[in-house]
């Protein structure tokens, strides 16, 4: 769903064979796979979704790959601190690009978690290294925002850090400032969410983890029902589901 975002960032930063990329919250590894296809060495860390990390391993570490290609790819079920041995004393930073593509700005408190990830990655990079963070665009430019409100409504008994909130204009800049990073450019990218039918849309949205609290507060059947109703306005005559969205990215640099 965020492929245009990944492509825009990689093209702007000229990701290639000289790139040593650290992907924070790498999820299913699609962004890492795209970087690896450009020749980059990639490392991904994720402590929140073991099932998605397992998919990343299938994508990035297939047995068919040669030894050299596999050596330039690493996946870790954990936090950036688990890569502390990569810091080394050789004078060469372990990574020269850090990405955190999991977009902030739709769940209250998500930026705090991102700040912790960025802080954990700081010892692994040198000065002036680009750090890319991403966020949802304005609610009026994101059709999916109305669907995400279902998560808030159903998770009301667990109200708090998991509640939906609209993205704010300076979300990314504030995250960078708190992490001690210097903003050095930004952009907006259209990332429409398209699905073959409602069933596929429900499965795809549930896989993001944004509805986990709603499922815990009610049950799977109730969440499915509410999601289908919320998706109805976005269903086309041919049965496909189409939701235009705008995402922002910020490039910041380490001091």
Per-range role (PLM):
Residues 1-19:
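Conserved alpha-helix/loop element of class I SAM-dependent methyltransferases that forms part
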Residues 20-22, 28-87:
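Class I SAM-dependent methyltransferase SAM/SAH-binding core
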Residues 28-30, 173-255:
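Conserved Class I S-adenosyl-L-methionine
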Residues 35, 120-121:
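Class I S-adenosylmethionine-dependent transferase superfamily signal
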Residues 99:
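A conserved beta-strand element that flanks and buttresses the S-adenosyl-L-methionine
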Residues 103:
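Hydrophobic adenine-recognition pocket in adenosine-nucleotide-binding enzymes
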Residues 106-120:
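A short, conserved alpha-helix within the catalytic core of class I
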Residues 116, 122, 126-194, 212:
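Conserved catalytic/acceptor-binding region of the Class I
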């Amino acid at each position: 769903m965020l492929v245009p975002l990944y492509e825009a960032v990689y093209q702007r930063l000229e990701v290639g064979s000289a790139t040593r990329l650290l992907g924070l919250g790498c999820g299913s590894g699609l962004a890492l796979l795209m970087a690896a296809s450009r020749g980059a060495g990639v490392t991904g860390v994720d402590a929140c979704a073991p099932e998605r990390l397992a998919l990343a391993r299938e994508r990035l570490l297939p047995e068919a790959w040669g030894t050299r290609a596999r050596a330039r790819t690493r996946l870790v079920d954990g936090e950036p601190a688990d890569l502390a041995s990569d810091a080394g004393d050789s004078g060469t930073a372990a990574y020269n690009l850090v990405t955190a593509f999991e977009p902030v700005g739709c769940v209250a408190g998500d930026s705090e978690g991102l700040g912790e990830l960025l802080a954990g990655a700081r010892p692994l990079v040198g000065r002036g290294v680009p750090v890319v963070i991403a966020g949802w665009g304005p609610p009026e430019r994101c059709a999916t925002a109305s669907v995400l409100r279902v998560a808030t409504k159903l998770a009301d008994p667990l109200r708090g850090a998991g509640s939906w909130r609209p993205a704010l204009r300076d979300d990314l800049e504030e995250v960078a400032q708190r992490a001690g990073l210097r903003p050095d450019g930004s952009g907006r990218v259209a990332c429409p969410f398209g699905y073959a039918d409602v069933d596929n849309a429900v499965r795809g949205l549930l896989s993001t983890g944004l509805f986990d609290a709603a499922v815990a507060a009610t049950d799977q059947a109730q969440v499915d029902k509410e999601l289908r109703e919320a998706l109805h306005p976005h269903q086309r005559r041919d049965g496909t589901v189409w939701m235009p969205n705008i995402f922002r990215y910020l490039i910041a640099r380490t001091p």
